[in-house]
């Protein structure tokens, strides 16, 4: 049983890697073929590894793990925020601030400041302050919310980190590894998989692909927390959705 079907992966464009000249040779074992200068990801491996990632995240959530979703590129920002929120977890979907994990104490101080400004407004303090000061406070709050709003209520450093595009989020991955935090990631053909604990070979540049994978991991968290199966499983049908079909789809899309 698979949590994501081959058909779903194909329809979302998960199989499209980067141009061959931009590849990382360490991803060779996850590449099925090359067509028209584009690497094609081996979706049979993606199906299997997505199952493993689902189980890993589900089991972590069942043990009350704090899970941080990270994806700051525009293709990932919305899905990361929406799915982390749906799963009752935390996210960073704008620029990663250096030291977010390794200098957590300083980040907590900034979060405290954000909460303080919000409390001032709720208690009516803004009404008695000069307009210029209120404008400055609003500007400060907006900036803090942009970068820290998704982790405002995160109780501690995360137990697991899920990353969309570890090539872009190298600083985040390095901080997690330094602290021994396992990293689950969508890894495209241009990335280095060595620092990733749970790899999902996938196109991390297509909005639909990011949404598909990210939503399944959110399902895993919900299942782990509630003890219910939040995801629809699919029988692996290698005849109907064989890896050879990927080549046909790629050739069709590239013609």
UniProtKB/Swiss-Prot annotation:
Superkingdom of origin organism: Bacteria
Molecular function terms, GO-annotated: structural constituent of ribosome
Matching SUPFAM superfamilies: Ribosomal protein S2
Cited InterPro entries: Ribosomal_uS2, Ribosomal_uS2_bac/mit/plastid, Ribosomal_uS2_CS, Ribosomal_uS2_flav_dom_sf
GO cellular component: cytosolic small ribosomal subunit
UniProt keyword annotations, A-Z: Ribonucleoprotein, Ribosomal protein
PROSITE patterns: RIBOSOMAL_S2_1
GO biological process, any: translation
Stated family: Belongs to the universal ribosomal protein uS2 family.
Xref: HAMAP family: Ribosomal_uS2_B
Name of the molecule in the record: Small ribosomal subunit protein uS2
Native source species: Streptococcus uberis (strain ATCC BAA-854 / 0140J)
Gene name of this polypeptide: rpsB
């Amino acid at each position: 049983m698979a949590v994501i079907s081959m058909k779903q992966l194909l329809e979302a464009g998960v199989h499209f890697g980067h141009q061959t000249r931009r590849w990382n040779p360490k991803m060779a074992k996850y590449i099925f073929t090359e067509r028209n200068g584009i690497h094609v990801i081996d979706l049979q491996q993606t199906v299997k590894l997505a199952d493993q990632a689902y189980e890993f995240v589900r089991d972590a959530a069942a043990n009350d793990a704090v899970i941080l979703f990270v994806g700051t590129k525009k293709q990932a920002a919305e899905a990361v925020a929406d799915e982390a929120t749906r799963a009752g977890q935390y996210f960073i979907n704008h620029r990663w601030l250096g030291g977010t994990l390794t200098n957590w104490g300083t980040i907590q101080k900034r979060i405290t400041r954000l909460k303080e400004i919000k409390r001032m407004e709720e208690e009516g303090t803004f009404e008695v302050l000069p307009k210029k000061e209120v404008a400055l406070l609003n500007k400060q709050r907006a900036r803090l919310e942009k970068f820290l709003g998704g982790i405002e209520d995160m109780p501690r450093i995360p137990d697991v980190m899920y990353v969309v595009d570890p090539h872009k989020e190298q600083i985040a991955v390095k901080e997690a590894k330094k602290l021994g935090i396992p990293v689950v990631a969508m890894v495209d053909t241009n990335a280095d998989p060595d620092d990733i604990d749970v790899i999902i070979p996938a196109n991390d540049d297509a909005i639909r692909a990011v949404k598909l994978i990210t939503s399944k991991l959110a399902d895993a968290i919900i299942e782990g927390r509630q003890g219910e199966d939040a995801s629809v499983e699919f029988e692996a049908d290698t005849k109907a959705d064989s890896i050879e079909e990927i080549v046909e789809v790629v050739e069709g899309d590239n013609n």
